[in-house]
Amino acid sequence: MAQANFGVVGMAVMGKNLALNVESRGYTVAIYNRTTSKTEEVYKEHQDKNLVFTKTLEEFVGSLEKPRRIMLMVQAGAATDATIKSLLPLLDIGDILIDGGNTHFPDTMRRNAELADSGINFIGTGVSGGEKGALLGPSMMPGGQKEAYDLVAPIFEQIAAKAPQDGKPCVAYMGANGAGHYVKMVHNGIEYGDMQLIAESYDLLKRILGLSNAEIQAIFEEWNEGELDSYLIEITKEVLKRKDDEGEGYIVDKILDKAGNKGTGKWTSESALDLGVPLPLITESVFARYISTYKDERVKASKVLSGPALDFSGDKKEVIEKIRKALYFSKIMSYAQGFAQLRKASEEFDWDLPYGTIAQIWRAGCIIRAEFLQNITDAFDKDSELENLLLDDYFVDITKRYQEAVRDVVSLAVQAGTPIPTFTSAISYYDSYRSENLPANLIQAQRDYFGAHTYERTDKAGIFHYDWYTED
């Protein structure tokens, strides 16, 4: 007998917490896990909640009111396909499957098309905020059939994080098929960029200025009170003050400098390459993680490859402020690249992505939540056809005032032999984007020389080829 309003498949921490989040809003939630003992564990732990414990998929599906609203919180990839395959014979036309996993958007597009043939609605939903966000309120990026989203929107709007600025829920319809998971993918790419920029700032403060963890922590705390106010700056200041619970000193100094990844940053860069969109800062942040994993080689190289030694004797306070400005400037470059990629993808896949709304739903609940996202929303509210954020008046003003600081910081780091790939990439992207003329004319001449790839001229229309092998 149907008794549940919503169902969640997958009782790992994200699935469990999302189920509890939905239940806390007054809904009865059916729960299922392939391993029954896991479902039973969650049920017994929360017997005071309106959870329906089910042992089989048949029992799970049968417990749900129609149209059934089922959220899949299982491992992305083959596990998701297997779960859908098992569910499909049990569902009725009009039922709604929601994939809340970290799914690659082409998989979501494929599943949406396949399930549409069976009359089953499919909503690929990017969920950001980690396990805490899942429980208390994540940022959610759903994409799929609009009429299906309308049936789950009341629940999503209740469980999503609420922006502190205006209390609006951090969820909105992104567009058809894979739009939601694409937006989440770019969110993750921007997250890579933000984290690497913060890491480089930390390295500059520590390596060049010789500041202690306590001093750097205080700097990040101050930065978080201004235009850099964000979740990642907030947790950075927390990380820097934590002591090692297994010995002396700070825990950050005991953590091996090898950064892991789950591949979502790579997906963002791969898609940018496929679309022909310049995404240098985010891509450099992916490569920075990769080179960090070459620890043994880096140790060997450090003993044989020479570099400059800089004994800094300047005004530390002045440099700290320049690093702050460089960080904000570079953050803007990262978001400008990310939103330019969203625009290109929206055109390519016919999604009509709501750019200003995307920035709005990232204001709370998600990893990249930041105060300056409102400036992005304002920019698209003023001009929905804005080609690049750098052309908006607010960002024009910031880049005009802060670019000198970035150039100084990059110069200082190069002189000190301190790697700052994303800071360097930021100013290079800015200079490339603002250049009326680039040396690509020479590249096109070379291509025409060795491969007869032709070229266009600046003085007249048409496609041309030069006879390079004829002597002057």
Curated annotation (Swiss-Prot):
Pathway: Carbohydrate degradation; pentose phosphate pathway; D-ribulose 5-phosphate from D-glucose 6-phosphate (oxidative stage): step 3/3. It comes from Lactococcus lactis subsp. cremoris (strain MG1363). Substrate binds at residues 102, 128-130, 187-188, 192, 262, 289, 447, 453. PROSITE patterns: 6PGD (PS00461). Homodimer. GO terms for biological process: D-gluconate metabolic process; organic acid catabolic process; pentose-phosphate shunt. Gene3D superfamilies: 6-Phosphogluconate Dehydrogenase, domain 3, N-(1-d-carboxylethyl)-l-norvaline Dehydrogenase, domain 2, NAD(P)-binding Rossmann-like Domain. Its EC number is 1.1.1.44. The active site is at residues 184, 191. Keywords: Gluconate utilization, NADP, Oxidoreductase, Pentose shunt. Catalyzes the oxidative decarboxylation of 6-phosphogluconate to ribulose 5-phosphate and CO(2), with concomitant reduction of NADP to NADPH. NADP(+) binds at residues 10-15, 33-35, 74-76, 102. The keyword NADP applies. Pfam families: 6PGD (PF00393), NAD_binding_2 (PF03446). This is 6-phosphogluconate dehydrogenase, decarboxylating. GO terms for molecular function: NADP binding; phosphogluconate dehydrogenase (decarboxylating) activity. Belongs to the 6-phosphogluconate dehydrogenase family. It catalyses: 6-phospho-D-gluconate + NADP(+) = D-ribulose 5-phosphate + CO2 + NADPH. The lineage of its organism: Bacteria, Bacillati, Bacillota, Bacilli, Lactobacillales. InterPro entries: 6-PGluconate_DH-like_C_sf, 6PGD_dom2, 6PGDH_C, 6PGDH_Gnd/GntZ, 6PGDH_NADP-bd, 6PGdom_BS, NAD(P)-bd_dom_sf, Pgluconate_DH.
